[in-house]
Amino acid sequence: MADLEAVLADVSYLMAMEKSKCTPAARASKKLNLPDPSVRSVMYKYLEKEGELNFHKIFNEVLGYLLFKDFCENDSEEPIQQLKFFEQIKLFEKTECYDERKKMARDIYDNFIMEEMLSHTYEYSKHAVASVQKYLLKNEVPVDLFEPYLEEIFTQLKGKPFKKFLESDKFTRFCQWKNLELNIQLTMNDFSVHRIIGRGGFGEVYGCRKADTGKMYAMKCLDKKRIKMKQGEMLALNERNMLQAVSTGIDCPFIVCMTYAFHTPDKLCFILDLMNGGDLHYHLSQHGIFSEDEMKFYAAEVILGLEHMHKRCIVYRDLKPANILLDENGHIRISDLGLACDFSKKKPHASVGTHGYMAPEVLSKGTSYDSCADWFSFGCMLYKLLKGHSPFRQHKTKDKLEIDKMTLTMNVELPESFSLELKNLLEMLLQRDVSKRLGCMGNGADEVKMHNFFCGIDWHQVYIQKYTPPLVPPRGEVNAADAFDIGSFDEEDTKGIKLNDADQDLYKMFSLTISERWQQEVSETVFDTVNTETDKLEQKRKLKQKQHFDADEKESDCILHGYIKKLGGSFASLWQTKYAKLYPNRLELHSESGNNKPELIFMDQVEDISSDFILHKNENCIQIRINDGTRDGRIILTNSDEIGLKEWSSSLRSAHKISQDLLGSMAKKAGKIYGSERDVNKSMYIFGGNCSTKTSNGSN
């Protein structure tokens, strides 16, 4: 029965993998809904405040670029050739074949540069033209041939085209997607979890599928009780921070990166790149030892993975074949950053890692070290791929003390079968003296890449994964140990462990979404489908809606507008959806239908607006205290959109302060004009920009 369950788990997992490769969007079991277009008002203020409402920020975001491109191609009143020019340059730069690049260079020159010169529009500088012509006349087409044009293209795009984009529906759609991204709060319900594929000290790794996009990931779940039992809280939080550091910015194809982190009451969850090809330790046992050329392929890709970490001042500290995972095509990624450490501010000195791979300085108590330790481990790993064991684990000994002693004292004897270049590489990597070790003499990974063993390697070709892997994992197999062989934790171990509020507080900042990776996921799966469906829904809504709430946004002094929830209804216990409009002197709360007159709250009636959110019905809320003689003195507002709620709170308090300052200023002026004696029952009243007075009973 257990065997049958294992087979069924494997079949289910493999079927999910195959379907996600073809049409991941079709595998989405949960619909992704964009917020109402009115969120534009809130997001405009948010992006402006965060310094993200500029051309380069939006243009360099995956979804921002796609929507700006859509605007240029389909919505702009005038043709925008600069974007097509830009895309052709980028395509040219990615073209590997020199002959193809020559043809593309000529086409780009004829269609964009020559055409612009003949039209006498003078959009580009003479310097840019001369630079390109100089190379073309010599029949040369370097990759950066058109680079002088890029900055000039950006200068033109960020002018009128970008300003028009900010006024368009495509920018509204960008605001909707950005708002959705910023409000991501993941739970286990957002994933379909498949079979277990690995286990570590604190938890397990499963294959999983993201419900709203259909994309397959690996889910690493750490048990909070087991972490507490082993006092591993800082290790778990450190792993999250290291994954964030290597996963943000320029993507590295040779590290298992993270897209999301979230937690439940019991688990810490990392959503990571899924690698289906097994690890090098597994393949070493199946395939046998590797040849020098085969090892060279893996070494080159690992070097680029380490280089990515080291540039971010991260020392990996656990390099070994078991942590090198293969994808379905045979390319590698370095996995498991549980022991990785940031050395930018303080160098570590803890003896952590795997015996037989740890550098001498890591084993020496109290000795600080940095990324140099990884190059020693790298040498140990290469030796194992070639010989089947660590250079310091002779005769299959498992005695950790003996292995450590040999690491600190033994000179490794390299087999005669090794080439001279390989011998020299390993001798330099396995130097106990850090100052003489390859990779540690001032130039880091470049020193290793320039070694004679790697002579002839085109490192750009390595980066774009153009070299053929020596081993392609079998398709239609899980390439991992059987689910029952992997086993499970003994629940009795943590039976007496209780998690309290202080334990949970440690993880309150744990949840995270890596923006560029989420946007890439969306663009590859459901972006077009969701946009099409949302366009249809919004068109229907516009036809039904009697009042267009945002119609007066440009023409009036409206500060902020959008949907918000107000506590009211029967017994003042229900949330009512309102369309709110904030003006300098008042807040208008319109019913959803727009049929009735809005509820008006004037700023001179407001006594106080809470500076912090109050908790009401388990919701973060804005509390407005008013004094008009007819209310209970409180108005409670909330919004499921965290970004929106913060902007409403900030804008309301700002409008109230300005109103109070204006009232105070006008009262002083009135005192100077009419004298200090006045009717204390009268107060200044601002309405629609006009000033009058009203008595305490409301009469004028």
Swiss-Prot record:
It catalyses: [G-protein-coupled receptor] + ATP = [G-protein-coupled receptor]-phosphate + ADP + H(+). ATP binds at I197, G198, R199, G200, G201, F202, G203, E204, V205, K220. Keywords: ATP-binding, Kinase, Nucleotide-binding, Phosphoprotein, Serine/threonine-protein kinase, Transferase. It comes from the Eukaryota. SMART domains: PH, RGS, S_TK_X, S_TKc. Residues 1-190 are annotated as: N-terminal. Residues 557-657 form the PH domain. GO terms for biological process: G protein-coupled receptor signaling pathway; negative regulation of phospholipase C-activating phototransduction signaling pathway; phototransduction, visible light; positive regulation of smoothened signaling pathway; regulation of signal transduction. InterPro entries: AGC-kinase_C, GPCR_kinase, Kinase-like_dom_sf, PH-like_dom_sf, PH_domain, Prot_kinase_dom, Protein_kinase_ATP_BS, RGS. GO terms for cellular component: cytoplasm; plasma membrane. Specifically phosphorylates the activated forms of G protein-coupled receptors. Belongs to the protein kinase superfamily. AGC Ser/Thr protein kinase family. GPRK subfamily. This is G protein-coupled receptor kinase 1. It comes from Drosophila melanogaster (Fruit fly).
